[in-house]
Amino acid sequence: MELNSQFNAFLTNIRPTDPQKEDWKGGAKTLRERLNNYEPLKDIVVSTFLQGSIRRSTAIRPLNGKRPDVDIVVVTNLDHNQIAPQEAMDLFVPFLEKYYPEKWVPQGRSFGITLSYVELDLVITAIPASGEEKNLLEQLYRSESVLTVNSLEEQKDWRLNKSWKPSESGLFISNSANIQDAPLSEWKAHPLVLPDRDENKWGRTHPLAQIRWTAEKNRACNGHYINLVRAVKWWRQQNSDNLPKYPKGYPLEHLIGNALDDGTPSMGKGLVQLIDTFLSRWAYVYSLRSKPSLPDHGVEEHDVLARLSAEDFCLFYEGLEDAAIIARSALASQDPKESAELWRKLFGTKFPFPGPQGGDRSGGFTAPTQPAEPQKTGRFA
């Protein structure tokens, strides 16, 4: 059975909590305000924005007191042809020493900042374009479409367009219902560049392309795509003893998007379809004991599976073969309790049993139409 009510409850149980959302929004806003008011960097910082699974609404609830991981991109107007990667990152060290003493560490392509309730990953980037193209891109990166700290799930009508604005009422519904994504020609050909201190070179990255693709895919899948990503991530976490460490994070998310058909009718059917498609699509690659390659949505020369070993891919494939048997049986079962027991084999106790009235029918848990607005605290003051 599809057990839609139970899947809704399951998703509520594995999403980040409202206090966790408050933590990362507070941390991001505080960092942005401090950067905007830090005089030595005022002339080079164009904007800061959230990226990663937090922004794309594909993050799951951290376990065992683990802090949420939040990726924050700092867009600068630095000329990457005139400044070395190490020099660019060094410009931000005095800022970090002033506001985050003994809380930050340098990383290969970013700075890690550990706060009481959140882990921030600060990524320094630059706009490589010049002239009028650069001016137009700076306008986009300064727009509310990019600056919003709301996730795709919270802002369902979000579009990558400098004319898009959220509602002034505080609700997660904007006043821009008829605005569509800006044409690809206006922004996609100009990824950001980021410094790699380990290799001492600049590389290309396009977080906006990943966010926009995710939003578009989620709409095409009736809102189920981001939730199926969460479900698979949770399954992977629950079965970590029997699965390889990789793929995880964005490579796993990308594999799911590659396998999921548009028009997803429900979580149960979507999960079975994407697993079956994954297994059939990569059966030949698996038979060779190899692995596929998949181009990044923003920087096509990047293979998102480049760091995934063939051995780990094959072990993951075998894990999905086992999961497919259970998922198909759970979907086919006409007994609500039996179906729930099978889904729980995949997802653990966060997936609830149906009530006395059974499974696929009206009533029971109803997902809220929009997230609750968390109470404010002074945690990031």
UniProtKB/Swiss-Prot annotation:
Binds 3 Mg(2+) ions per subunit; 1 is probably structural the other 2 are probably catalytic. It catalyses: GTP + 2 ATP = 3',3',3'-cAAG + 3 diphosphate. The active site is at 69, 71, 121. GTP 1 binds at residues 53, 56, 210. The keyword Nucleotide-binding applies. Residues 348-381 are annotated as: Disordered. Keywords: Antiviral defense, GTP-binding, Magnesium, Metal-binding, Nucleotide metabolism, Nucleotide-binding, Nucleotidyltransferase, Transferase. It is an enzyme of class 2 (transferase). Mg(2+) B binds at residues 69, 71. SUPFAM superfamilies: Nucleotidyltransferase (SSF81301). Its EC number is 2.7.7.-. GO terms for biological process: defense response to virus; nucleotide metabolic process. InterPro entries: NT_sf. GTP 2 binds at residues 109, 197, 204-205, 307. The record marks 51 as: Important for GTP discrimination. Mg(2+) C binds at residue 196. Signal peptide: none annotated. Mg(2+) A binds at residues 69, 71, 121. Cyclic nucleotide synthase (second messenger synthase) of a CBASS antivirus system. CBASS (cyclic oligonucleotide-based antiphage signaling system) provides immunity against bacteriophage. The CD-NTase protein synthesizes cyclic nucleotides in response to infection; these serve as specific second messenger signals. The signals activate a diverse range of effectors, leading to bacterial cell death and thus abortive phage infection. Belongs to the CD-NTase family. D02 subfamily. This is Probable cyclic AMP-AMP-GMP nucleotide synthase. It comes from Salmonella paratyphi B (Salmonella enterica subsp. enterica serovar Paratyphi B).
